[in-house]
Amino acid sequence: EVDRYWVVLAALEALADRGDIEAKVVAEAIAKFGIDPDKRNPLDC
């Protein structure tokens, strides 16, 4: 299921890939939103 947290995470990952934000921001979002980093990203399914 794609919810708002996965959408935000995908956007943050794209920004980090471009170098616009630090990777730690992505890690902080994962912790804050309680996202299981081992779970497959539903946007990629």
UniProtKB/Swiss-Prot annotation:
<comment type="subunit">
    <text>Homodimer.</text>
</comment>
<protein>
    <recommendedName>
        <fullName>Pyruvate dehydrogenase E1 component</fullName>
        <ecNumber>1.2.4.1</ecNumber>
    </recommendedName>
</protein>
<keyword id="KW-0560">Oxidoreductase</keyword>
<comment type="function">
    <text>The pyruvate dehydrogenase complex catalyzes the overall conversion of pyruvate to acetyl-CoA and CO(2). It contains multiple copies of three enzymatic components: pyruvate dehydrogenase (E1), dihydrolipoamide acetyltransferase (E2) and lipoamide dehydrogenase (E3).</text>
</comment>
<dbReference type="GO" id="GO:0004739">
    <property type="term" value="F:pyruvate dehydrogenase (acetyl-transferring) activity"/>
</dbReference>
<dbReference type="InterPro" id="IPR009014">
    <property type="entry name" value="Transketo_C/PFOR_II"/>
</dbReference>
<keyword id="KW-0786">Thiamine pyrophosphate</keyword>
<keyword id="KW-0670">Pyruvate</keyword>
